């Protein structure tokens, strides 16, 4: 930073003259020309790339839930809170931003916690051509609503029971556990959202 001004000398006598003449230390700054620090404009290409990456990650998570609903969860519908997969994708991008290979070095294990038991749903490798540098374990949580069990009770006794399976409702909360694979210390970060 370069500052110029009307002071010819910066010795203590010159400064004391200014202070005695009615200048206040706060007003000294207004007498100098100075460089303003300008925040750089965000790179539009980076913003578009990050948004595209986030949307691709959202699609991966939604496909994982869609594949798992009948095979591993045994239900006909999975109700996902609005913007849940978007929030998860943003957190995954944030956690991967400090990694050497970024999101490309991520392996994500997707689980569902039902009544304090974790059920494995899928394993997502973000880029198979890159050696993984960290693992993320995503744990979806089931919504604990009493009305869902009543609905299942009433529909399971009628003539509609053969065609209907239960509906799984996900909670808006989730857990992300990050484990670095290249660190000797084995750094683990747990985020509860």
Curated annotation (Swiss-Prot):
GO terms for biological process, alphabetical: negative regulation of signal transduction
PANTHER family: DNA DAMAGE-INDUCIBLE TRANSCRIPT 4-LIKE PROTEIN, DNA-DAMAGE-INDUCIBLE TRANSCRIPT 4 PROTEIN DDIT4
Protein name: DNA damage-inducible transcript 4-like protein
Biological function: Inhibits cell growth by regulating the TOR signaling pathway upstream of the TSC1-TSC2 complex and downstream of AKT1.
Gene Ontology CC entries for this record: cytoplasm
Family of this protein: Belongs to the DDIT4 family.
Swiss-Prot/TrEMBL keywords: Cytoplasm
InterPro entries: RTP801-like, RTP801-like_C_sf
Annotated localization: Cytoplasm
